[in-house]
Amino acid sequence: MIKSFKHKGLKLLFEKGVTSGVPAQDVDRINDRLQAIDTATEIGELNRQIYKLHPLKGDREGYWSITVRANWRITFQFINGDAYILNYEDYH
């Protein structure tokens, strides 16, 4: 279950369906990924080829990343079946 957001646009999309805070061409993909994250009870459930799930390293250790489009990712921490600090970013 999603517990917290860093990115205000993701939060508005997830909680209220407001699309103005994310790129219009990515709304469907972002919604798909948010729903998958929200229903996942373990990180392995997000290990779909299309998501390219992977753990981050270095100063981002403890965070996971899934692909939305090109370099854009949803990053988050996954602790005891819950997702925290969801962000939409290009960290490359």
UniProtKB/Swiss-Prot annotation:
A single GO BP: RNA catabolic process
Gene3D superfamilies recorded: RelE-like
Recite the UniProt keywords alphabetically: Endonuclease, Hydrolase, Nuclease, Plasmid, RNA-binding, Toxin-antitoxin system
Q: Which InterPro entries match?
A: HigB-1, RelE/ParE_toxin_dom_sf
Record site: Interaction with HigA: 14, 31
Q: Which PANTHER family match?
A: TOXIN HIGB-1
Described function = Toxic component of a type II toxin-antitoxin (TA) system. A ribosome-associated translation-dependent mRNA interferase. Inhibits translation by sequence-specific cleavage of mRNA. Prefers either in-frame or out-of-frame 5'-AAA-3' codons (lysine). Also cleaves the first three AAAs of stretches of four or more A sequences. 20% of codons containing AA are cleaved and occassionally cuts even at a single A.
Protein's name according to its UniProt entry: Endoribonuclease HigB
**Organism of provenance:** Proteus vulgaris
Q: Which gene encodes it?
A: higB
